[in-house]
UniProtKB/Swiss-Prot annotation:
Cross-referenced Pfam families: Cpn10 (PF00166)
Complex and partners: Heptamer of 7 subunits arranged in a ring. Interacts with the chaperonin GroEL.
Subcellular location as annotated: Cytoplasm
Gene Ontology BP annotations: chaperone cofactor-dependent protein refolding
Name of the molecule in the record: Co-chaperonin GroES
PROSITE patterns, sorted: CHAPERONINS_CPN10
InterPro entries for this protein: Chaperonin_GroES (IPR020818), Chaperonin_GroES_sf (IPR037124), Chaprnonin_Cpn10_CS (IPR018369), GroES-like_sf (IPR011032)
Source taxon at top rank: Bacteria
Alphabetized UniProt keyword annotations: Chaperone, Cytoplasm
Length: 98
C-alpha cells in the first residue's frame, strides 16, 4: 500500500503493530485493558532536519524498519481507512532487529 502522507523534516510515519491479544497463560486481554502499542513498521520517512550550519541530517530509520517508540509520542492520523502515527525521529527509541 502506498502512503499518501509525506512527512517533513525528521518526522516518520509508522503503521502500529497490534499488541499481544492473549497472555502467556492463554487469557484473552479485553480492549479496555490493552496497553497502547509501542511497536510499528515505518511506512514513510522525511528528508531529515536541517542543522545550525544548514546541512541536512538524515533520519536513522528507513521504510520497512520495525521500530519501538515512546508510548505517548506522535500524532495519530487516519488516511485511506488506515490508522497511522506520525512521529518525530526523537520519539523512536530503537530499531527491532529480528
Amino acid at each position: 500500500m502506498s502512503v499518501s502522507i509525506k512527512p517533513l523534516e525528521d518526522r516518520i510515519v509508522v503503521r502500529q503493530l497490534d499488541a499481544e491479544q492473549t497472555t502467556a497463560s492463554g487469557l484473552v486481554i479485553p480492549d479496555s485493558a490493552k496497553e497502547k502499542p509501542q511497536e510499528g513498521e515505518v511506512v514513510a520517512v522525511g528528508p531529515g532536519r536541517v542543522d545550525d550550519n544548514g546541512n541536512r541530517v538524515p533520519v536513522d530509520v528507513a521504510v520497512g524498519d520495525v521500530v519501538l517508540y515512546s508510548k505517548y509520542g506522535g500524532t495519530e492520523v487516519k488516511t485511506g481507512g488506515e490508522e497511522l502515527l506520525v512521529l518525530s525521529a526523537r520519539d523512536v527509541l530503537a530499531i527491532v532487529v529480528k
